[in-house]
């Protein structure tokens, strides 16, 4: 397990609703159990003898364990008080959480039961999976896929707790609540002042989260397995609400308890005992995961003929977005951001939940309304212990086009199979091309991937960081593939290379700011680094915040510079990192900010609204987004009572022209059939104003001019 990832999770802010907070608590409990088992196993393996490095690792883990226990106990205490208050009003008892001391006993018992039942589950799988694997070749007009499906595809099933044991836990927990209420002063005496302050801060944050949950309290009785939702509460029309479908079944847009949701309906509605276990296991796996890049499972219905999984409603998936014939795909940088979202979600599955997805593909990467990518469809997912492997004895499961060769060859595999799939996803997202269009049969495809080790050709135009990551991910040897923790780190470099086109600018960002979540940097930090590179004081550069700070982040203290905005500045104004021309370019930028006629990067439509009703030759200069390198500026002015627009082109100068053009560029503007050339934008505007082509600088306000159609 990734300790750094766990620390981030522990220090993350609490969910704002009760259901998510309960899931968060359950995730903490799983991490706690896994860490405790890991330390005990390490001591057993070494017969109690450990090295200094192992000792440091164990001490670090115990610190993390302590942090988890402290946060869990605070949540328990507050929820217990909430439940006791409700039970007094309702004459019922329904404790939410089981105390840690009692839970350890329960966990030990459950671990023994799970160990005893593992062999039984494996035997049941072998007995029930008598059907041969099915290969499905889906030859649609838009997409050609091959899926390999087995009826029973889960090895791990959660164990049910006996009712008597749950009742005993509830009694024990109530006793603990009473003791906590009766002896608060004694507990306080054993805490230092710093510990008391820390506990109060933790409880205050949790109280704030609980305050947002609403007055209506849901039933808090504990049960294992997915939450059962009555079928009559899931409402949708099979004709009008269809979102998509595949070999497994169909997905519909629905309403459940007033909330818009997605409902996955399997084709097979009458399930055998083993199939029902598999279905519940899929839901249970989804229920264990709480992460912004994983689709949230809300519950399920297991009633025969009404079998369904209910999850949060997403807008679309990456396959529809990338391969749509009606809409152009997003720019490369945005597509790579989507890949980073997916990598973060998978890293969480591997690092915290020990879950292998096993069916990663564009169709299973969902997109929310805010363009966040989330991992979905856990039909083939399996829980795997760290350092162990799995194997498909009766045939591989998943989608063949994205399937790792070791899985296809029925060899042992681990989480690196997901890494292989991600390599193909990364390639597909970068090229917007379908995978392996030349193959329609499984046998030649198997030979190409497994024996000949063929992979799609990577275009030379790709940034080196992207090419290298793709090649590492789809390496034939699983041991040479990176972990998803490494993938997420490398994706930050890929984002920089795809967001920032200039070599010097990209190197500046990588050297100074590349780190996890490094898509933006505070202005104060940015200008300090820029000052040290271009050898200009921060006081001189400070006005540039008006250009560099992204408008969507202005509300933050000092503002934020995003990679996209930084790249645009480098395209619009040129390479201000150049040792010869850089200072002149930066001073030109600062001078432009003083001019009333400079209107930043407003759109053509806004410029025309500002010019409406103005006198002849009223003008403004704006930055152009159409081609920011070749035609970075546009002059908009009134002519004959109508707005007109002229683009200003820019090109590099020759070595013998440097004295005439100190910024390293020359700017050209058409005028009366001729082309006028200037060494700077300010020089150009001053000359056009002198000869009468431009007159009054346009203010940033608009004049309300009535039209006949108004």
From Swiss-Prot:
Residues 83-136, 189-232 are annotated as: Disordered. One of its GO terms (biological process) is signal transduction. SMART domains: S_TKc. Its main location: membrane. Residues 237-495 form the Protein kinase domain. The keyword ATP-binding applies. GO terms for cellular component: cytoplasm; membrane. Pfam families: PK_Tyr_Ser-Thr, SH2. Residues 83-94, 107-129, 197-208 have a biased composition (Low complexity). It catalyses: L-seryl-[protein] + ATP = O-phospho-L-seryl-[protein] + ADP + H(+); L-threonyl-[protein] + ATP = O-phospho-L-threonyl-[protein] + ADP + H(+). GO terms for molecular function: ATP binding; protein serine kinase activity; protein serine/threonine kinase activity; protein tyrosine kinase activity. PROSITE patterns: PROTEIN_KINASE_ATP (PS00107), PROTEIN_KINASE_DOM (PS50011), PROTEIN_KINASE_ST (PS00108), SH2 (PS50001). It is found in: Membrane. Belongs to the protein kinase superfamily. Ser/Thr protein kinase family. SH2 domain-containing protein kinase subfamily. PANTHER family: DUAL SPECIFICITY PROTEIN KINASE SHKE, SERINE/THREONINE-PROTEIN KINASE TNNI3K-RELATED. This is Dual specificity protein kinase shkE.
């Amino acid at each position: 397990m990734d300790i750094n990832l766990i620390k981030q999770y522990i220090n993350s802010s609490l969910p704002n609703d009760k259901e998510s907070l309960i899931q968060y608590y359950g995730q903490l409990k799983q991490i706690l159990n896994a860490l405790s088992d890991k330390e005990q196993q390490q001591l057993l393996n070494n017969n109690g003898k450990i090295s200094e490095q192992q000792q440091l690792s164990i001490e670090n883990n115990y610190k993390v364990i302590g942090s988890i226990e402290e946060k869990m106990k605070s949540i328990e205490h507050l929820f217990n008080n909430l439940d006791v208050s409700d039970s007094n009003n309702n004459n019922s008892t329904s404790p939410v959480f089981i105390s840690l001391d009692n839970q350890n006993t329960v966990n030990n018992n459950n671990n023994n039961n799970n160990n005893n039942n593992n062999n039984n589950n494996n035997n049941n799988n072998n007995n029930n999976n008598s059907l041969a694997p099915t290969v499905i070749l889906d030859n649609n007009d838009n997409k050609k896929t091959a899926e390999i499906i087995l009826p029973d595809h889960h090895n791990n099933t959660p164990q049910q707790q006996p009712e008597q044991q749950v009742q005993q836990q509830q009694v024990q927990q109530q006793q603990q609540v009473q003791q906590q209420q009766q002896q608060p002063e004694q507990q306080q005496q054993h805490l230092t002042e710093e510990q008391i302050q820390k506990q109060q801060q933790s409880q205050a944050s949790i109280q704030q989260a609980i305050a947002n949950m609403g007055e209506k309290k849901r039933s808090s009785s504990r049960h294992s397995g997915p939450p059962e939702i009555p079928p009559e509460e899931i409402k949708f029309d099979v004709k009008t609400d269809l979102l998509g479908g595949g070999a497994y079944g169909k997905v519909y847009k629905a309403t459940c308890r007033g909330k818009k949701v997605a409902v996955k309906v399997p084709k097979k509605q009458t399930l055998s005992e083993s199939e029902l276990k598999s279905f519940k296991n899929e839901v249970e796996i989804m229920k264990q995961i709480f992460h912004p890049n994983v689709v949230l499972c809300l519950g399920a219905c297991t009633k025969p003929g009404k079998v369904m999984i209910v999850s949060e409603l997403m807008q679309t998936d990456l396959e529809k977005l990338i391969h749509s014939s009606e809409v152009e795909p997003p720019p490369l940088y945005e597509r790579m951001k989507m890949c980073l979202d997916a990598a973060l979600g998978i890293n969480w599955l591997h690092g915290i939940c020990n879950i292998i997805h096993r069916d990663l593909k564009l169709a299973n990467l969902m997109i929310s309304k805010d363009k966040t990518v989330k991992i979905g469809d856990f039909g083939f997912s399996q829980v795997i212990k760290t350092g162990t492997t799995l194997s498909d004895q009766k045939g591989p499961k998943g989608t063949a086009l994205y399937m790792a060769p070791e899985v296809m060859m029925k060899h042992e595999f681990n989480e690196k199979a997901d890494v292989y799939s991600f390599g193909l996803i990364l390639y597909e997202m970068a090229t917007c091309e379908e995978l392996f269009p030349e193959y329609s049969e499984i046998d030649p495809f198997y030979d190409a991937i497994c024996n000949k080790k063929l992979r799609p050709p990577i275009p030379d135009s790709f940034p080196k960081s992207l090419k290298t990551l793709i090649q590492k991910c789809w390496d034939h040897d699983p041991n040479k593939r990176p972990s998803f923790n490494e993938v997420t780190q490398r994706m930050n470099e890929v984002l920089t290379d795809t967001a920032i086109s200039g070599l010097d600018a990209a190197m500046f960002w990588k050297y100074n700011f590349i780190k996890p979540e490094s898509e933006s940097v505070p202005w104060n930090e940015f200008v300090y680094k820029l000052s040290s590179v271009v050898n200009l004081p921060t006081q001189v550069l400070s006005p540039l915040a008006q250009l560099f700070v992204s408008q969507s982040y202005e509300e933050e203290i000092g503002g934020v510079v995003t990679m996209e905005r930084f790249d645009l500045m480098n395209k619009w104004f040129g390479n201000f990192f150049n040792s010869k021309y850089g200072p002149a370019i930066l001073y030109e930028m600062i001078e432009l900010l003083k001019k009333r006629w400079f209107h930043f990067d407003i759109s053509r439509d806004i410029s025309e609204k500002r010019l409406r009703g103005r006198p002849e030759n009223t003008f403004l200069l704006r930055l152009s987004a159409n081609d920011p390198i070749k035609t970075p500026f546009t002059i908009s002015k009134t002519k004959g009572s109508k707005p007109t627009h002229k683009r200003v082109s820019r090109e590099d100068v020759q070595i013998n022209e440097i004295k005439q053009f100190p910024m390293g560029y020359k700017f050209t503007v058409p005028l009366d059939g001729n082309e006028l050339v200037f060494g700077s934008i300010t020089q150009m505007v001053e000359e056009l104003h002198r000869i009468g082509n431009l007159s009054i600088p346009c203010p940033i306000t608009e004049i309300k001019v009535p039209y006949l159609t108004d």
